[in-house]
Amino acid sequence: MINVQDATKRAKDHLREFFPEADEVQLEEVELTPDKAYWLVTLSYAGVSNSVASSLLVGKSLRYKIFKLDAESGEVISMKVRDFK
């Protein structure tokens, strides 16, 4: 079984592979599922706003991704957008 540090590193590596422009990557949440089968890792990163007006007003906005990793092998099973509403 991989440990929490390894799960976090693998999630960060996966994020950077698909979003090389991701800046200021931070760990937000990490959880081992009750059955100990998966690690759920939530990362945030600074993203440039899509609109010029928003960029001028707020600059960078935080984006969130949640990763599901197989706790035994460390394989990334999924990456999803995490919205806070």
Annotate each predicted stretch with a short phrase.
Residues 1-85:
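Long, terminal "pre-/pro-" and other extracytoplasmic accessory regions
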